[in-house]
Amino acid sequence: MLSPTNSISKTAPVPPQDSSKPVLISEEPQNQLLQKVARTALAVLLVVVTLGLILLFYSFSDLQSFPWCCQTRPSTKEQPTISIPVPLPSPPLAVPRPSTPPPPVISRPSTPPAPTPAISPPSTPSAPKPSTPPPLPPKAPKPVKTQEDLLPFVPEQVFVEMYEDMARRRIIEALVPAWDSDIIFKCLCYFHTLYQGLIPLETFPPATIFNFKQKIISILEDKKAVLRGEPIKGSLPICCSEENYRRHLQGTTLLPVFMWYHPTPKTLSDTMQTMKQLAIKGSVGASHWLLVIVDIQARRLVYFDSLYNYVMSPEDMKKDLQSFAQQLDQVYPAYDSQKFSVKIAAKEVIQKGSGSSCGAWCCQFLHWYLRDPFTDALNDLPVDSVERHENLASFVQACEAAVQDLPELFWPEAKALF
């Protein structure tokens, strides 16, 4: 006999003669089969829905750009041309090819196919058609650069002249050293021993372009006071007694006024400050010595600048001195009513190739003027700058040897006229 549990899961033995009857299947395997079929159908449904959503949210051009997109063969049926954009920066134009028909439109099976318009970047302007390119403007001819334009040829003579100038400057600087105010004052004291009419005015502190006129007027006022027997109103020199100074003023006929000039300061106080700074450093810098000769006997103002126009142009300086000469006519009139005249001595740059010989040149010109005030010695200067400074070096050596016996920074004793 069979148990009740086995009756559900197992079948009764089939007689051999009845083999044509169907074999019965239990209910539990049948349920499992139905579950598998349902799961498969659900998976297929999800795949179909997913593909449908993809088709809804992606255009044809996006689908065709995927790597799994199938490549279809072109059909013979005429289809509208679809322009597929290419990423920037150079999108090509969609031009139908006569030999190859365009690809068909891929659409969903549930909805009828619809033509897709051409897609192009909104910010990209349409390019011109290849068949009608715009005319190009004519190009300007490029200048032809030769080797001379890139590397200009420098003649060998230029290098030779540069070397000669450098050698000449070194020779000149070795011949004529820079003269300071002490050497210039000693030179004036030496000139006084040769020409009694010259007054050796102190050069410490020297006159400047801002106060030389006041200094000349003050000396002439003191000279008038001495001639009248009156006391001196101006300040006395530092290294000269009052009696000796009065004797110098009484017999003087020529005032050599040395001016110290620097192009940077614009006032008298700034000039004195610059002078002090250069003296501490022991450097001449851009300073320059100028000379104004006041010839009382000849009633003449003579201006000498070895650099010719270092302060201002000779024309402007002459106009300024002519105005000052009219003022001197009122301050120190002549007995015969003769007026002061003005002369600009230098007609060119005298100290060529040297930047520190201005003081020596001023003393050299003063010495020439004392020997003969009516002869222009500058006309006889050598043309060659080295030869010119060799002559100046001879004068400098003679002066330096002569002033060695003079007292240190003291005025020489003037002789009384009566």
Curated annotation (Swiss-Prot):
It is a single-pass membrane protein. Residues 1-10 have a biased composition (Polar residues). One of its GO terms (biological process) is protein deneddylation. Residues 86-141 have a biased composition (Pro residues). GO terms for molecular function: cysteine-type deubiquitinase activity; deNEDDylase activity. It comes from the Bacteria. Pfam families: Peptidase_C48 (PF02902). Belongs to the peptidase C48 family. This is Deubiquitinase and deneddylase Dub1. It comes from Chlamydia trachomatis serovar B (strain TZ1A828/OT).
